[in-house]
Swiss-Prot record:
It comes from Chlorobium phaeobacteroides (strain BS1). It is found in: Cell membrane. This is Phosphatidylserine decarboxylase proenzyme. The modification Pyruvic acid (Ser) is found at residue 182. Heterodimer of a large membrane-associated beta subunit and a small pyruvoyl-containing alpha subunit. The record marks 181-182 as: Cleavage (non-hydrolytic). Its main location: membrane.
Amino acid sequence: MLSPYGKGTLVTSLLISLLLAGAGLIFPGIVQAVFSTASVGLALFALFFFRDPSRTVPSEPNAVLAPADGRVLLIKKIAHPFTGQNSTLVSIFMSPFNVHVNRIPLQGRIAHLSYSPGKHLMAFNHASMADNERMEIGLENSQCRIIFSQVAGFIARRIVCSLRVGDNVAAGSRFGMITFGSRLDIVVPESTRLTVSKGCKTVAGETVIGYVK
């Protein structure tokens, strides 16, 4: 399955691929081989990049799911106005080779959305959390409030978020993507029992990163 969030970019890439293939037919020999290789390479890269595999979402209602594929880059205690004092930040680094579609970590209602333009520092630079372009999303339900942020990086400079304030969302459902990877930060309340540690691999919509008490 291919992600609908990158449909425009995917179509453009495939059209360029066809143009390269057509140009290759005009020139004989090595030039033709170069154009043909570039055409196939671009098409395969576009299909690989915008892949959107199905996921088996855990049925546990108090489970907080990973919102992104990648690896846990950072875990630390912070204070956040939406989640309160002694909240826990979990940062997930998404490489260009990960699936880039983001998923909702917990069932609830979207109570807050805030887009901030900014820099494009490397995603593994922790200053990127505050300084980089990002979309901050606040979710609440009867148990808790959580906040998660799509953070653009040095390569990833396009954030896609389909959410609106007031939307009711299901855990594990798709809500957007960050093109070419980067990072996704999630802040959970103090009462959350984490089940991941730094370096753990995460799969969006499947990996349980913690349980809300």
